[in-house]
């Protein structure tokens, strides 16, 4: 039996590690969830994701309630108060229970002397909630994004930035990819209906289904047998442009966790696929995905800037480069991105993308296809990146995705759509 732990203090410490130490929630959360009961796993996730999604608001409210910020060893208490405020604002947890559990969290973080302070701030918010929220709704913090990112979105999308921000602040839809080697999408939707769930087919991507209500994977018909994979619709869009064929040699570069590797093999089961990623730890998930789906690919650890180290002089018929990026298109799915990224990261990422593109291009056969993709919405990583590549690469030609002046196709996040994603299809002359 799992030891009873204070979830509020665990959530506070996790959020502190993200914001103060730059750690990814996807690395922090799973080990924490192993320490709590199954019924508490979902609540711990909700508290962590929710606080990170609304961090600007919670920070603003605390600053209004306290004369000076908490620093040093008391900083965890700041995040514990955030967890308390989030529960009062956004959950159905009875206020008395939210307060009691949050105040008790002070003992778990070894700050029992601050129980009174935590209780006082939360009760003050309850008394002044209406006035505080009215004032908050006129502040810049209401957009729940860091100012540097807000400025970039406003510059890139003067007409659409608010809808992008609103989409980023919502809970993401759950998209699935139906394995066409097992069932047609319509057949699987009928199985889903029999299981008491409802799904909606994507209009453009032939394998994509959006669940009406997110569900645990073990409840999905045939998940363990490889009939279905959790993958956002926009990520599935890569196959529309890559169009892999049986018998071809195909490179999936920056492949982890393997969603696109396995999609290539569903579309072209007899393709010879090489999946490469720089992160050896994340490559284990590529193996896991291949195993669950009963597929085979050559999996290698390697740096995209130095392809000769892992593929020699080999050339490929098609290359999918899902480039390392700011991930500003998937904020609704990973709200910690807002607080992990910095403005200075963008030119550094653009430089890295440029180096990988230049290094991998010679490994594409003449007449071959390279699809450049990112889960970013920032032009520096997307249209401007491809525009510069076309200008310096004489044998590269843009195909089907945009114009040389405005290259690529940009998806923006939407409530019933996929994540923010960019694609450019390039042909080697």
Swiss-Prot record:
Its main location: cytoplasm. Keywords: Cytoplasm, Methyltransferase, RNA-binding, rRNA processing, S-adenosyl-L-methionine, Transferase. It is an enzyme of class 2 (transferase). S-adenosyl-L-methionine binds at residues 254-260, 277, 303, 322. It is found in: Cytoplasm. GO terms for cellular component: cytosol. GO terms for biological process: regulation of DNA-templated transcription; rRNA base methylation. Transmembrane segments: none annotated. Gene3D superfamilies: Helix hairpin bin, NusB-like, Sun protein, domain 3, Vaccinia Virus protein VP39. GO terms for molecular function: RNA binding; rRNA (cytosine-C5-)-methyltransferase activity. Its EC number is 2.1.1.176. The active site is at 375 (nucleophile). It holds the Pfam family RsmF-B_ferredox. It catalyses: cytidine(967) in 16S rRNA + S-adenosyl-L-methionine = 5-methylcytidine(967) in 16S rRNA + S-adenosyl-L-homocysteine + H(+). InterPro entries: MeTrfase_RsmB-F_NOP2_cat (IPR049560), MeTrfase_RsmB-F_NOP2_dom (IPR001678), NusB-like_sf (IPR035926), NusB_RsmB_TIM44 (IPR006027), RCMT (IPR023267), rRNA_ssu_MeTfrase_B (IPR004573), rRNA_ssu_MeTfrase_B_ent (IPR023541), RsmB-like_ferredoxin (IPR054728). HAMAP family: 16SrRNA_methyltr_B (MF_01856). NCBIfam families: PRK10901.1 (NF008149), PRK14902.1 (NF011494), rsmB (TIGR00563). PANTHER family: NOL1_NOP2_SUN FAMILY PROTEIN _ ANTITERMINATION NUSB DOMAIN-CONTAINING PROTEIN (PTHR22807:SF61), NOP2 YEAST -RELATED NOL1/NOP2/FMU SUN DOMAIN-CONTAINING (PTHR22807). Specifically methylates the cytosine at position 967 (m5C967) of 16S rRNA. Belongs to the class I-like SAM-binding methyltransferase superfamily. RsmB/NOP family. This is Ribosomal RNA small subunit methyltransferase B. It comes from Escherichia coli O157:H7. The gene is rsmB.
């Amino acid at each position: 039996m799992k030891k009873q732990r204070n979830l509020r203090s665990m959530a506070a410490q996790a959020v502190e590690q993200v914001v103060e130490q730059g750690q990814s929630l996807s690395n922090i959360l799973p080990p924490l969830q192993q320490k709590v009961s199954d019924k508490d796993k979902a609540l711990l996730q909700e508290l962590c994701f929710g606080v990170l999604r609304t961090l600007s608001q919670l920070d603003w409210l605390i600053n209004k309630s306290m004369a000076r910020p908490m620093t040093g060893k008391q900083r965890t208490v700041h995040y514990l108060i955030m967890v308390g405020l989030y529960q009062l604002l956004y959950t159905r947890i009875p206020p008395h229970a939210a307060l009691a559990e949050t105040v008790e969290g002070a003992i778990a973080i070894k700050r029992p002397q601050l129980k009174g302070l935590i209780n006082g701030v939360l009760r003050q918010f309850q008394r002044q909630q209406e006035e505080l929220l009215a004032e908050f709704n006129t502040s810049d913090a209401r957009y729940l994004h860091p100012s540097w990112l807000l400025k970039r979105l406003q510059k890139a999308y003067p007409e659409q930035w608010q809808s992008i921000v609103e989409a980023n602040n919502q809970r993401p839809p759950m998209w699935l990819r139906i394995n066409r080697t097992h069932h047609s999408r319509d057949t699987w939707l009928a199985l889903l209906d029999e299981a008491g769930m409802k799904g909606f087919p994507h209009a453009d991507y032939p394998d994509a289904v959006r669940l009406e209500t997110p569900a645990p994977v073990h409840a999905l018909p045939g998940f363990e047998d490889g009939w279905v994979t959790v993958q956002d619709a926009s990520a599935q869009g890569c196959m529309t442009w890559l169009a892999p064929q049986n018998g071809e040699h195909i490179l999936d570069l920056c492949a982890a966790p393997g969603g696109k590797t396995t999609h290539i093999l569903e579309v072209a089961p007899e393709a010879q696929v090489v999946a490469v990623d720089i992160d050896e730890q994340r490559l284990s998930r590529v193996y896991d995905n291949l195993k669950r789906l009963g597929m085979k690919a050559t999996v290698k650890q390697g740096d995209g800037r130095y392809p000769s180290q892992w593929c020699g002089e080999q050339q490929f018929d098609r290359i999918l480069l899902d480039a390392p990026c700011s991930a500003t298109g998937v904020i609704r799915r990973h709200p910690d991105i807002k607080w992990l990224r910095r403005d200075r990261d963008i030119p550094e990422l653009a430089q890295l993308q440029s180096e990988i593109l230049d290094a991998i291009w010679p490994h594409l056969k003449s007449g071959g296809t390279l699809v450049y993709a990112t889960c970013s919405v920032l032009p520096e990583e997307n249209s401007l990146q491809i525009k510069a590549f076309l200008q310096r690469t004489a044998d590269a030609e843009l195909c089907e995705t945009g114009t040389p002046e405005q290259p690529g196709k940009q998806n923006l996040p939407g409530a019933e759509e996929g994540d923010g994603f960019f694609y450019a299809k390039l042909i080697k002359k």
